[in-house]
Amino acid sequence: MNKLHSFAHWKSALTLVLLVAGLPASAQTAQPSGSREGVPTLSGYMEVHLNKEQDLPAEADLHRFVLMVGHSFTDRIKFWSEVEVEHAFVEGAEESGEVAIEQAYVDLMLHRRFNLRAGMVLIPVGIVNERHEPPTFHGVERTFVDSVIVPTTWRDIGFGAIGDLGRGFSYRAYVVPGLDATGFTADEGIKDGRQQGGHADASDPAVTGRLEFRRGGLTTGGSFWYGGSGFGLTRLDIEPPTVGVSSLDARYRRGRHELRGQWSMVNIGSAGDLNRALQLQSGNSPNIASRLLGAYGEVATRVSPDSWQHEVVAFGRYELFDTQNKMPEGFLPLEEFQRSALVVGATYFPDPDVAFKFDVVRERNKSSVVNAPWRVNLGVGWWF
């Protein structure tokens, strides 16, 4: 990709972000938030899991330990960061642990409706990718939809705008580097195509955004990601595939009851050409789909008496997550990746910021050969 073409991509992406954000009609002062000026803020969360999968030994894991640091240089210039350690320690490979910067950005507060953000940002798609502290969701593990369809945790270097539009509406919109299509797979879709902000190739940018509405106990949101994924294919004679991600979600809480749902879809352009090109490169076709689709619905109810100071919440969730939903011409779906799951369990809150969790997961797929496993999970998580 030549420099002129790359510049044109970035110019178009920045223009779209500004159009999504909109400019304020007046020049009111943005309201300060975060730590007091000159005083750093420390926060964090942790989650420990005990997982037992069918026919496998039980596994105990300090899955995540995260520290967050914020600082207000002035009432208009604010910094926020998040450093994560996965699986307790690092020993040369991600399977043995990982240290990662999940967020590290600066906000320039200009106006309630329009403020600038730059740095390492979380892609604002779905519910869990931006808000995944353990007490904020039921179940020991994150949802399948937010792991397989929306590749949580999804982060990258970004520049864009955030704001509160009033009447319950807010938004976030960024320009970010694109994906690496050579990492796409049949079972986890675009997950291994994330660049994660480390020496990210920015020649084929993407735009991403979210519009959110809050009113009382209801929160709804619509989000998207759209951009290129072809920089890793420069040696192959194919048109760089574009990727579009769209997602709708809703959360509602009233009294003892909670409802939550999400629908997410990924479209991969030129998936057939991509499969053929990668097969020539590696000798095996990755069988990448042209469309991935996922959705879930969750119901939760507080079952502890009102006289208790602590809360016990029972929940049930049904998920569909199909990474072979639509195949390019000439390719057949792998039925073991057309999946569903039923998750039932309970969460005990001795404090609103501490959660002890239990669930049972029954996963299914359409294959008559590959059996999906069942799992029993225990976990504890907190944040402060």
List each language-model region with its residue ranges.
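N-terminal periplasmic/intermembrane-space "pro-region" immediately following the signal or transit peptide
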Residues: 1-7, 14-56, 384
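Short strand->helix junction
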Residues: 7, 88, 365-367
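Outer membrane beta-barrel
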Residues: 30-181, 203-220, 291-304, 313-326
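Outer-membrane beta-barrel pore domains
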Residues: 52-54, 93, 104-109, 137, ...
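Short glycine/proline- and charge-enriched loop/turn segments
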Residues: 135-143, 189-192, 276-280
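Short, P/G- and charge-enriched loop/turn segments at secondary-structure junctions
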Residues: 145-148, 195-198, 237
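Loop-centered beta-sheet repeat module
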Residues: 188-233
